[in-house]
Amino acid sequence: MMRKKIVVFMVLLVLAVGVTGCAQNTAAKNAESAGKISIVTTIFPVYDFARAIAGGQAELTMLVKPAAEVHSYDPSPADIIKIQEADVFIYIGGENDAWVSTILESMDTSNKKIIRLMDAVKPVEEETVEGMEAEEEEVVAKTTQNKTEPAEEEIEYDEHIWTSPKNAILMVNEIAVALAEIDPQNAAVYTQNAADYTAQIQAVDDEIAGIVAAAPNKLLVFGDRFPFRYFVDEFGLDYKAAFPGCSTDTEASAGTLAYLMNTIKENNIKYVYYIELSNQNIAKAISEQTGAGLLQLHSVHNVTKDDFDAGATYVSIMQQNVENLRKGLANQ
């Protein structure tokens, strides 16, 4: 909560003192001089979808840099300028994007296309399953005339919507429609590029569905955060994990470790999973105590700089996941 207040204050200060009146950011300049649209995105999957659709018709910016911790990202003054000067701003719209509304409310967005991708899918509430470390919630109270009552709890939706390939297809199509509207001259290009990319995503989706259908094991155990709610919901998989998807915790309690170890032993699970950019400490501890092998399942939330520079995409990462999913579900 305190971090969000600081972000809000910083945003208001930047806009109030007119920092946005400074020279244009490089991406916006390049886009204008080349006759292209300028697109600003928040995180990697959004950037990748926009890249695939726009092709060479846009200048792209990703605010959260490769290898950065997405859940602790705060927009810098330079980031705010980039958003204000962009033709298109694309974001997820979940808990970690709480800062976006303050920025947009303080800007003239009449000539800008704003795309909130959670509006393109059916979001589900965050959940804590058995054995998982519960997140520490800030206790907020409201005072009435004679007593203090807990404030109504806001519903928090799981923001990792892109982990479902079917959702990813919806997101790609949403972006394509928006780009065609703001840049009708290249509408046919955007439509074709979106069709090509969704076909690639669908191919991966079909392959995963086939693996799951043939698998003797339908349970995934994560010694890590779990950002795959939409993924397991789509494919009908069960899971156990140390932390929810947006948790910033890195150390599990003895109770959580014991629960995950017992789950592996009781179900004869051969592999424990960890996610990208993880220190793998919990997964390694579970592996050492149970003999389970280690496998990565990449949520595509962010990538390393090397992977980014090498041209990693949503599809290429999901194709890597296919092999580790096949291995884990085969349980051999």
Report the location of each language-model feature.
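Compositionally biased, low-complexity segments enriched in small residues
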Residues: M1-M2, T144
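Extracytoplasmic metal-acquisition and chelation regions
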Residues: F9, C22-Q332
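Sec-dependent N-terminal signal peptides of Gram-positive bacterial secreted proteins and lipoproteins
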Residues: R3-N25
